[in-house]
Curated annotation (Swiss-Prot):
Changing F212V: Impairs oxidation of L-lactate. Shows a 27-fold decrease in the L-lactate/glycolate oxidase activity ratio. The keyword Transmembrane helix does not apply. The gene is lox. Binds 1 FMN per subunit. Homotetramer. Its EC number is 1.1.3.-, 1.2.3.5. Its cofactor is FMN. It comes from Nostoc sp. (strain PCC 7120 / SAG 25.82 / UTEX 2576). FMN binds at P81, M82, A83, S110, Q135, T163, K239, S261, D294, G295, G296, I297, R298, R318. Keywords: Flavoprotein, FMN, Oxidoreductase. This is L-lactate oxidase. The active site is at H263 (proton acceptor).
Length: 365
């Protein structure tokens, strides 16, 4: 295979990133749970759906702008929450945040970030407007959750994105085989500043990561959402919904947006692909909350397919990590710009100049 020095698509970024990352880090980022069936399906479903272009439409001016929860975006994508970004580059989440903000798009920061939520917010504050959400869990230690929410609100995050598909960690066999640990010098930056945490001593692994895994709460129910919403006025986004009845219930319990997601295929192997779940969820929500989607986005045409079925925007994950590994902020910026260019070209070729006009008539399902 010819060596790739300047990637021209997201798949080439993945190939090049492998040469920049340790095997343990690459496997952590790329792997799914179990046999990785859901991981593969997230991509395969986009390849199965074909497009039906319209001809002789004026596409001389393509408009990619949209909004999510009233916050403007220059294109319909956000950076998905991803842990441990300093595994890919020393600037980690700071580089990602700078790239997202400079492109006029949004970023969802993971609780398990290796740069603190305050540091990342400061980067975003240099751009106006800047869309940053904070991803979190409701931990067994409610004091930990409360502290994170209060810090996110004080730092200026625009929404709380609650991950609901992780009552326990999925069976990620590559990580087990590699005995995955955080390298020396990397920390869960959002937890190191919280006093009073009972961090276990775990030889050969990160005590903080062990503590976090123990804090996942399999006893959570819908009723716990009321407590979370009482902590701040920030809108609540639920990430990890795959059923229409759950989506309808999310709206009843106050969610302002839903991210249709199977955690990148990293939780329940054999779960439905995100795009396959999207139509039922859009119908169930019926315009009462905004619907977003993550999982499998690699091309501008993929974004069109998700929007046609009813997503307001999409989130991209692993390709951002590949860009980060290859070139830091510049690499992430290039990944975003590649998708933006592909989306712009695809919009012209399907005969549609406005995102709001994309619908299922453009799809061959």
């Amino acid at each position: 295979m010819t060596a790739i020095s300047s990637p021209i698509n997201l798949f080439e970024y993945e190939q090049l990133a492998k040469t920049h990352l340790s095997q343990m880090a690459f496997d952590y980022y790329i792997s799914g749970a179990g046999d990785e069936i859901t991981l593969q399906e997230n991509r395969a479903v986009f390849e199965r759906i074909k497009l039906r272009p319209r001809m002789l439409v004026d596409v001389s001016q393509i408009n990619l702008t949209t909004s999510v929860l009233g916050q403007p975006l220059q294109l319909p994508l956000l950076i998905a929450p991803m842990a441990f970004q300093c595994l890919a580059h020393t600037e980690g989440e700071l580089a990602t945040a700078m790239a997202a903000a400079s492109a006029g798009t949004g970023m969802v920061l993971s609780t398990l970030s290796t740069k603190s939520l305050e540091e990342v917010a400061e980067v975003g504050s240099k751009f106006s407007p800047s869309l940053q959400w904070f991803q979190l869990y409701i931990h067994k230690d409610r004091g930990l959750t409360r502290a994170l929410v209060e810090r996110a609100y004080a730092a200026g995050y625009k929404a709380l994105c609650l991950t609901v598909d992780a009552p326990v960690l999925g069976q990620r066999e590559r990580d087990r085989r590699n005995e995955f640990v955080l390298p020396p010098g990397l920390h869960l930056a959002n937890l190191t500043t919280i006093s009073g945490l009972n961090i276990p001593h775990a030889p050969g692994e990160s005590g903080l990561f062990t503590y976090f895994a123990q804090q996942l709460n399999p006893a959570l129910t819908w009723d716990d959402l009321e407590w979370l919403q009482s902590l701040s006025p920030l809108p609540l986004v639920l990430k990890g919904i795959l059923r229409g009845d759950d989506a309808a219930r999310a709206v009843e319990y106050g969610a302002k947006a839903i991210v249709v997601s199977n955690h990148g295929g990293r939780q329940l192997d054999g779960a439905i692909a995100s795009l396959d779940a999207l139509p039922e969820i859009v119908a169930a929500v019926n315009g009462k909350a905004e619907v977003l989607l993550d999982g499998g986005i690699r091309r501008g045409t993929d974004i069109i397919k998700a929007l046609a079925i009813g997503a307001q925007a999409v989130l991209i994950g692993r390709p951002v990590l590949w860009g980060l590994a290859v070139g830091g902020q510049a690499g992430v910026s290039h990944v975003i710009s590649l998708l933006q260019k592909e989306l712009n070209v695809a919009m012209a070729l399907i005969g549609c100049s406005q995102l709001q006009d994309i619908d299922t008539s453009f799809l061959h399902l």
